[in-house]
Amino acid sequence: MDIERINDHTMKFFITYIDIEDRGFNREEIWYDRERSEELFWEMMDEARDHDDFFIDGPLWIQVQAVDKGIEVLVTKAELSKDGQKLELPIGVDKIIDIPLDEGIESLFQQELVEEVEEQTGTNFNEDGTFGFLIKFNDFEDVISLSHRLIFEDIKDELYSFEDRYYVYVEFDEVLHDEEEIDRILSIILEYGEESTLTIHRVSEYGKQIVKEHALETIRNNFPAKT
């Protein structure tokens, strides 16, 4: 792990996915499992303290960015304002910005993580407790083959075309579908396509929606399976 001290208030970390795995974590759980991500974070902070006497004596402002080979974490010491209603963040010599606590610092950080995961993996998290996956197919014949292989219920699926590729968006309700079932369905889908790095928001906005609902069932009913 690389540690760089930006100034008296800020430290910058870069840790590779290989290093993360060597520490007993995996790249998925640091985004999805809050307890494990906090465990990794405090392990990093302990090293920062030993490395450069970066002691924590108050609230922190944390920015996380995913890059190709790992993650970058920027940690800035903050202070509560005298009235206790704002966080004061130093951004330069004699410069401070105020962030109202009622904006929900924790929710802002969590939303940044969610947006970063969506951008990196094509996974979409929704406020209603559902989450979706966007799968890319290079050939429509692969979508046809999948439609005859996989039959499911209570799962939202849509079909899009974008930049000469086809995309199937599937959305799961974690109340109706357990992790084992979701993994089974995704493993079958990924035999025919690959997880997209695009988000459903981009594909739905700039691409063309071919089938709005029951996409695989519609394809199965209109295109015979290849023998």
UniProtKB/Swiss-Prot annotation:
Signal sequence coordinates: none
InterPro entries the record matches: MecA_C_sf, Neg-reg_MecA
Domain of life: Bacteria
Keywords: Competence, Sporulation
Pfam family, one: MecA
One term of GO molecular function: protein-macromolecule adaptor activity
GO biological process: establishment of competence for transformation; negative regulation of establishment of competence for transformation; negative regulation of sporulation resulting in formation of a cellular spore; sporulation resulting in formation of a cellular spore
NCBIfam families: PRK02315.1-1, PRK02315.1-5
Record note on domains: The N-terminal domain has binding sites for ComK and probably for unfolded/aggregated proteins; the C-terminal domain interacts with ClpC.
HAMAP family referenced in this protein's UniProt entry, alphabetically: MecA
Known partners and oligomeric status: Homodimer.
UniProt family annotation: Belongs to the MecA family.
Function, as annotated: Enables the recognition and targeting of unfolded and aggregated proteins to the ClpC protease or to other proteins involved in proteolysis. Acts negatively in the development of competence by binding ComK and recruiting it to the ClpCP protease. When overexpressed, inhibits sporulation. Also involved in Spx degradation by ClpC.
Protein name according to UniProt: Adapter protein MecA 1
